[in-house]
Structures are given as C-alpha cells and as structure tokens.
UniProtKB/Swiss-Prot annotation:
Binding site for substrate: 21-23, 37, 60-63, 119, 152
Gene Ontology process terms (BP): gluconeogenesis; glycolytic process
Keyword Transferase in record: yes
Keyword Glycoprotein among UniProt keywords: no
Provenance organism: Desulforudis audaxviator (strain MP104C)
Reaction catalyzed: (2R)-3-phosphoglycerate + ATP = (2R)-3-phospho-glyceroyl phosphate + ADP
Name recorded for this polypeptide: Phosphoglycerate kinase
Record localization: Cytoplasm
Amino acid sequence: MLKKTIRDVDIAGKRVFVRVDFNVPFNERGEVADDTRIRAVLPTIEYLLTGGAAVILASHLGRPKGKRDDRFSLRPVADRLSALTARQVRFAAEAVGPETEAASRELAPGDILLLENIRFYPEEEQNDPEFASRLAALADLYVNDAFGTAHRAHASTAGIAAHLPAVAGLLLERELDILGRLLSVPERPFVALIGGAKISDKIGVLERLIEKADYLLVGGGMANTFLAAQGHNLQASLVEADRLETARYLLAKAGPGERITLPIDLVVAPDREQPEKRATVAVESIPAGWAAFDLGSGTVRLYANRLRPARTIFWNGPVGLFEVPGFDRGTLDLARVIAAAEATTVVGGGDTVAAVKQAGVLDQVTHVSTGGGASLKLLEGRELPGVAVLQNR
C-alpha cells in the first residue's frame, strides 16, 4: 500500500471526517433493508473511536440531483449505525452550515456525528472548492473509506483533501491491496468471469484481463456481441451492433486458443416475460425471433471446469437475467462453483453481489468488493481521483 492509512497518523483527540458509502436500500417502512455497506466500514470507525478520535461521517444516498429530498435522507442510517455500534450516533440535518459547525466543535473523543446526504448539495458533484473547504472546516483529518465512489472527483472524495491531511481507511486499504494483487501477482491459474449487458461498459477491463488472466470467461449480454462478431445469428438477443469491431479486436488480441472462452449453448425464449417457454440450444441454433437470457447447461459445465482448478478468480457481472426465475440458473450455479473453489475469490458489482447473496454463498467468497465502477477503473489501470489525493507513505 503506497498511501498512508489511519494506522500511519496520530488520531488521538482529533475530529476525523470519514467519507463512507452508506448508499443502502430502505424497506417500505423507511428502515435500512441491507446494512452490508454500513458493516463494511465498522472496523475503521471502531479503530478511530478506540484511538481517541471523534468521527464525522459523510455519505451520499441515491440520486437526489443536488437538492433536498427526504426520500434520500440518511436519518434512518443513523439509527441503524447506533444499533450496530451500541453508541449514540448524532445526526446533523445539514452537511454544512453554522449548526453543523457548532455540533462538530462540541464532539468529544468517542462521539459519532453523521451528516445529512452530501448529494443534497449540487456543489458536491461539482467538486466546488468552497464547499470542500466548508466540509474540511468540520475536522482535523480526512479519511476516505468509500471505495465505491473513489473513481469520482467530488468535493467529499477529492476536493476536501486540499484542506486537510488525507489518508485511507481500513476498507479502502483492503480494496486497494486485494485488487492490486489481483493484477500484479495473482496465484495461477487466474480465471476471470465477466458478465453484464454491454462490452462498451467494460472495454478497458476486458483488455487488461486478456493480458493478465489465463482464461477470460464471458457471459451475459456481452457474450452475444462476441458471438455475433464470430458470425453467429443471435436472432432477437441483445447485441451491440456498434461494438462488433471491438469484439473482433479483443478476440484477435487474445490470440488463438480459448483464452477468451465463449458460450457453446444458451437458454433462449420468445421474450423475457415467457421463461416457462425457455429452451436450451446451441449458439448456432437459436429459433427465429427468440432471444438468449442465460447460459446453457453445457456452457455452465465448460465454465465450471475452467473455474474449479483456478487459484485466483475475479467475477464481475451476472451471466444471465438472474432476477427472472428460469433465467437464473447459470448465474447461481457459477456463483456456487466460485464459492467452492480452492482459490482467492473476488466478486464485484452490485448485481454480482446480489447474485452471490441469492445463491447463499456470500460468506464463502474471499472478498466482496464494495465498488463496481471503481473496481473496474482500478483493474483497467486507471488512477482513482479519491485515491490520488491521499498522502503517500
């Protein structure tokens, strides 16, 4: 780890501004429905509190578009965090302003203050220097523990570091270490499973994985585009017609052999609303007007045989329309294969994590990345703005 972390600085008696990712779902009663992201940052919070710091937490929630919207208030998160930490968590109804500044000055070691949704302010996503300065005025030290937003140059992820000493939290440190090792010194065989709808979303990471992985297994809608680039008729399946040349370029870059491994059969149906009519067919035998919605059983076996001997596995993106019963088998079966592998297993992306949970194997993977877009940018070799601004060791 080339960046300083909270272990490298004096925290006793300090007010510490921690950027976290509490972008969590609520249930119909307005309570936190899934506290995974809150639990992920607890080690950082506990380390700071035990070390004699007062903690000021800032996060976004949803997309309020730069204005107050009570549907996206973080107040319910304060209640959940209080339960998880067994401490009173104070809540500031404004992220900045005289009342919040007064509340921050009154904090004693061991106190926690959660600010209201940072994206209620348009200046946040604009990385406004004045807004960043007002956030910095609340604290003595800045900590980024929000890997999921580290690829964004916002006031609370980048701009604030111009005004305070800036270091990484324990969650961010773990993400950078694990994902960094994934590409620098992976134990081999290294197998990557990449799904999702579009090649265009993942061109950079596909290029990098072709160079680094022993096998790159492709699923989801993007597999259709690769198959179409090889000349297969995918009928009504999702295909990015404007990315066929990109797919051919990636296949050529991989060279002969099966470094890029594509489906040999697919689960097809007349449309997504009729899974009961599904059939498994070879990729060259899709009925006219039908579309692919999942990997076929032969492909699942092929991919499982690539994954089982692996010593390092990275998975991003479901391989089918797993949220629809009948089109979920490929994703869930491969989730269980990955979880059972004697390998370092890293999964990332919101849909992928949801699939692993649905398969009941979340606790069996080595690392669940808290950042979808951020993990892909890092694996591409791109510098993350929220990491670049942190102090070097």
